UniProtKB/Swiss-Prot annotation:
Belongs to the enoyl-CoA hydratase/isomerase family. This is 3,2-trans-enoyl-CoA isomerase. A motif (Microbody targeting signal) lies at residues 278-280. The active site is at E158. One of its GO terms (molecular function) is delta(3)-delta(2)-enoyl-CoA isomerase activity. The gene is ECI1. It comes from Saccharomyces cerevisiae (strain ATCC 204508 / S288c) (Baker's yeast). Its main location: other. Keywords: Fatty acid metabolism, Isomerase, Lipid metabolism, Peroxisome.
Amino acid sequence: MSQEIRQNEKISYRIEGPFFIIHLMNPDNLNALEGEDYIYLGELLELADRNRDVYFTIIQSSGRFFSSGADFKGIAKAQGDDTNKYPSETSKWVSNFVARNVYVTDAFIKHSKVLICCLNGPAIGLSAALVALCDIVYSINDKVYLLYPFANLGLITEGGTTVSLPLKFGTNTTYECLMFNKPFKYDIMCENGFISKNFNMPSSNAEAFNAKVLEELREKVKGLYLPSCLGMKKLLKSNHIDAFNKANSVEVNESLKYWVDGEPLKRFRQLGSKQRKHRL
């Protein structure tokens, strides 16, 4: 299968030895992602999966946010789609929401390489959900947090968070944060072993943070039999893979009802016009 892939102006990738490095590079827009950007992330994971020389997939970002989640422009674009293009609202949102979310979440769930996230700042929404699907997370400092503003946006859990958040943070903490739109702050992440290492670097120094993580990883893999790493990931993942696959299907089908009813669109419009407090 071809190892070539289309380009994306917001996301780059490169391969260095056993590392497949994905870089979010739209800091001026807080690395917000449109639907096609999330699909591109999934395509990159598939590309890394097919490369036999790759053992670790590293996701880095830039600026002060890892990713602020879905770009309002993408939501507006879907809202403005010609109604004649779709026979029903259900058909419209199956195309604009369900297919995309199932695809990118599945790409993260089934990824065979060790997934490493370099958390240079906050992550929001679906982007934060994908962070929670990573195997190892390093933080730039103690200012990082994850926020899942589903209740504030008229939505429900997505991106496997029905399973990943209780698994990694505990059931009651997950309820508290999701029900009341509270962030999973650094202390919560540390208490639950979610952050493997805090690099204690300034938030303005994302590029130096990314370079430092990569430098340490190069040292850590020296002398390892890397196929063993993939074998262990496969076994560890087998504990929860069925639950994640089920959650991915149930989440999008339940969420579809909310999109069809129109509440998320109304709330995104309010955010765009500043009528509702911004989720960031």
